[in-house]
Curated annotation (Swiss-Prot):
Highest taxon of source: Viruses
Organism for this UniProt entry: Mycobacterium phage L5 (Mycobacteriophage L5)
Protein name: Gene 22 protein
């Protein structure tokens, strides 16, 4: 088993547990149409690297964060920005999850409107590089 956590195993629980995103479905794989619920945030790793000086301690994955709603473009932009603020706060506060924590955040592509892949919905997407570390332990 890999020593480094999947970025989704760290970021998704942070988003799911924040009261600002209450009622929002947070996924790492978009459910089948029969089980899809809006509003929704989807996280997908699209690349990134490990720290060359500490490859088993720190990784810098790039994730695609996509917000979907059926409410309209403005509401979808606001959902994306709220989720982004939750991640910024998690970095600032050192929020721990069972899988690890976020150490840094950098927007490689800011919020961008795309055609939604799903009927009657809106889509805002951005790319974010997150610093990820394993959980803190005391020895």
């Amino acid at each position: 088993m890999a020593r480094m956590p999947r970025v989704q195993a760290v970021a998704a629980p942070i988003l799911r547990s924040d009261p600002r995103l209450e009622g929002v479905t947070v996924t790492t794989w978009v459910p089948d149409v029969d089980f899809r619920e809006f509003p929704m945030i989807n996280l997908r790793r699209i690349g990134g690297t490990r720290n060359p000086n500490a490859p088993t301690l720190h990784t810098l994955p790039v994730v695609e964060m996509t917000a979907y709603t059926r409410d309209g473009l403005i509401e979808t932009e606001e959902l994306y920005e709220t989720a982004l603020e939750v991640l910024y706060d998690a970095v600032e506060n050192g929020t721990q999850t069972p899988a690890g924590y976020l150490t840094s955040i950098f927007e490689t592509m800011g919020a961008t409107q795309f055609s939604s892949l799903y009927q009657d919905s809106w889509r805002i997407q951005g790319l974010i590089r997150l610093g990820v570390r394993r959980p803190r332990t005391t020895l």
